[in-house]
Amino acid sequence: MGTNTSSLRPEEVEEMQKGTNFTQKEIKKLYKRFKKLDKDGNGTISKDEFLMIPELAVNPLVKRVISIFDENGDGSVNFKEFIAALSVFNAQGDKQRKLEFAFKVYDIDGDGYISNGELFTVLKMMVGNNLSDVQLQQIVDKTILEADEDGDGKISFEEFAKTLSHQDLENKMTIRL
């Protein structure tokens, strides 16, 4: 892929258009942004380079977001991974993909369920020391009790989706280009 060259080839842009909701113009704009973020010019964005983005640096879930962007698990994000992940947040992105992304934030081990421990870990990232561990555990227990319909002590994707069914994910998980 042409991430090390100065521009994307037309066939690369066309291929990315098929898998995302981005226009050719948006893909080219995102590529320029990607190249600016790729400080060392190696064609990937490292975790350190991601942390230089002011909006992400202050996000308590930044490490979880980066790990989800990094589909192949090599510790950095190439342009194909970057555009695929951002397409979830496109205004034309569907609610299902937004739900799947949100679920992955909580499903740390990727087993398809959000356990008590995973929910505690992610919520701890968000609240820091603003709540005691006891208070946080009470919130986790209550959340699982309310969302866990089959009584297995964890939250499946279906249970997660149902719990968030009344949330406005289309707007809350959308970035404007």
Swiss-Prot record:
Record: residues binding Ca(2+) 3: 107, 109, 111, 113, 118
UniProt binding sites for Ca(2+) 1: 38, 40, 42, 44, 49
Keyword presence, Ribonucleoprotein: no
Keywords: Calcium, Metal-binding, Repeat
Sites where the protein binds Ca(2+) 4: 148, 150, 152, 154, 159
Molecular-function annotations in GO: calcium ion binding
InterPro entries: EF-hand-dom_pair, EF_Hand_1_Ca_BS, EF_hand_dom
Boundaries of every EF-hand domain copy: 25-60, 62-92, 94-129, 135-170
Entry similarity comment: Belongs to the calcineurin regulatory subunit family.
Subunit structure: Composed of a catalytic subunit (A) and a regulatory subunit (B).
Comment field (misc): This protein has four functional calcium-binding sites.
Protein name per its UniProtKB record: Calcineurin subunit B
Protein species of origin: Naegleria gruberi
